[in-house]
UniProtKB/Swiss-Prot annotation:
Function description: Presumably involved in the processing and regular turnover of intracellular proteins. Catalyzes the removal of unsubstituted N-terminal amino acids from various peptides.
Cofactors named for this entry: Mn(2+)
Name assigned to this protein: Probable cytosol aminopeptidase
Recorded name of the encoding gene: pepA
Residues holding Mn(2+) 1: 276, 353, 355
Organism: Bordetella petrii (strain ATCC BAA-461 / DSM 12804 / CCUG 43448)
């Protein structure tokens, strides 16, 4: 998708296949809609009064308006004017792009980012517009025998109309949003691929492909022997249950900070269970197909690296991905087994379906060698987090208030929100074992919290936060598919650090 800017002069003379103008739920027209209304002898107001309610993201296409050069004027709902905010703007931009896709339009012009929003500057509005357009034009057909090429979106270019003095900031926001959209696209596609295609080896190959495409990226993909040499006994114990070879992926983005700093890199750690059957503690058959999404933490790390490399972000970032399958077999972990992690801590495995923390703990120990300024792990870790927060907010766990504030702010800014969960030391008692240093589960109460508490035992050498994306990484039902979250949150966090 190509994005560019144009000045607001002579809107009615812009020649385009589709021109988007905003309409509020109370019938009030945005400034751009008012211009088009006057040029068309009040045609817009007449239609709005008769049949358009202005719900956020709703669209109504008007063809061949008199006095207007655009082939189509698309009325886009903005919601109530008194409640218009960044989320309503994103819904409007996505609704417009979706309408263009449905009409098989190749290029379009939007005036929506020009509508001012309190505490949301034009750069942020432009960034959101590009992300929304990317979401509307995403199309998956990688595993269809005969892909319907006519179903692929034709929309290739959107021009944002803004005030002349805002063009530079708008263009920067569009550039950032486009990169984030590309990262989300990669994340979604990796998540949507089936487990027999998107294997640990496939994830490693994807990382290598990114490193070939972007000169700022370096990659190392470790195999079983190398992981054994590191002493990653916990990770190995999970991988042992499958014939599919494990991979431990180390990605580095060597940014060039404007100012020299002694601070270490930001490290992102992704859970890469490419299929999770639960192991010996077998999951129910219903919806087990969705356990291909158990690598969405890893996918989000790869998507984030794709975005930050495209932007050439002046920041040093390391990505770590522990990738394997969790299957039942004669070599798989058994309830009651005890394994030794890379940190030296022993773990009693009471439930083999709590495997994500078993691979992450060794990755968190590996992260120590980078002397990081902060570590954020991303994982579809617990169903308990879905029970607690549903599918709206990602669960955020940390005892570092400053890091929590930075991640929460990034979530609000990017509309990829998180909610901070408790991590009181008292929860650690649930992880006590009579036979090892720690048990891998703490019983039903506060399951997402005790999972985070388990990880915290392996992250004491640095500032650390855990994002549980079990409720936000994918959707079920008729719209089943990966969402690309939390790439926007992670990228906003990194943009704020740069």
């Amino acid at each position: 998708m190509e994005f560019s800017t144009q000045s607001t002069a002579s809107l009615h003379q812009i020649k385009t296949a589709a021109l988007a103008v905003g309409v509020y739920a109370d019938g009030e027209l945005s400034p751009a809609a008012d211009v088009i209304d006057r040029a068309s002898n009040n045609a817009v107001r007449q239609v709005v009064k008769a049949e358009f309610r202005g719900r956020p993201g709703a669209t109504l296409v008007l063809r061949a308006l008199p006095g207007v050069s655009a082939q189509r004027v698309v009325l886009v709902g903005l919601g109530k004017q008194s409640e218009y905010n960044a989320r309503a703007h994103a819904a409007a931009e996505q609704g417009f792009a979706a309408a263009c896709v449905a009409a098989r339009i190749t290029e379009a012009v939007s005036t929506l980012a020009a509508n001012s929003i309190a505490d949301t500057p034009i750069r942020a509005r432009a960034r959101s517009a590009a992300i929304a357009a990317g979401a509307a034009t995403y199309h998956y057909d990688a595993t269809f025998g005969k892909p319907d090429r006519d179903a692929r979106p034709k929309l290739k270019k959107i021009v944002q109309v803004v005030e002349r003095g805002e063009a530079a900031q708008t263009q920067q926001g569009l550039r950032e949003g486009s990169a984030i959209a590309h990262g989300m696209e990669l994340t979604r596609t990796l998540g949507n691929l089936p487990g027999n295609v998107c294997t640990p080896t496939y994830l490693g190959d994807t990382a290598r492909k990114l490193a070939r495409e972007f000169k700022s990226l370096k990659v190392e993909v470790l195999d079983r022997k190398q992981v054994e040499a590191l002493g990653m006994g916990s990770f190995l114990s999970v991988a042992r249950g499958s014939d599919e070879p494990l991979r431990f992926i180390v990605l580095r983005h060597a940014g060039k900070p404007a100012k020299k700093s002694k601070a270490g890199p930001v490290v992102l750690v992704g859970k890469g269970i490419t299929f999770d059957a639960g192991g010996i503690s077998l999951k129910p058959a219903a919806t087990m197909d969705e356990m291909k999404y158990d690598m969405c933490g890893a996918a989000s790390v790869l998507g984030t690296f794709r975005a930050l490399a495209e932007l050439e972000l002046p920041l040093d970032v390391v990505g770590l991905i522990a990738a394997c399958e969790n299957l039942p077999s004669g070599k798989a972990n058994k309830p009651g087994d005890i394994v030794t992690s890379m940190s030296g801590q022993t773990i009693e495995i009471l439930n083999t379906d709590a495997e994500g923390r078993l691979v992450l703990c060794d990755a968190l120990t590996y992260a120590e060698r980078f002397k990081p300024s902060a570590v954020v792990d991303i994982a579809t870790l617990t169903g308990a987090c879905v029970v607690a927060l549903g599918h709206v907010n990602t669960g955020l766990f940390t005892q570092d208030d400053a890091l929590a504030d930075a991640l929460l702010a990034a979530g609000r800014q990017s509309l990829d929100t998180a909610w901070r969960m408790p991590m009181d030391d008292a929860y650690q008692d649930q992880l006590k074992s009579n036979f090892a240093d720690v048990a891998n589960i703490g019983g039903p109460p506060a399951g997402s919290v005790t999972a985070a508490c388990f990880l915290s035992r392996f992250a004491k050498a640095y500032r650390w936060a855990h994002l549980d994306i079990a409720g936000t990484a994918w959707r079920s039902g008729k719209d089943k598919g990966a969402t690309g979250r939390p790439v926007p949150l992670l990228m906003q966090f990194l943009l704020d650090q740069a």
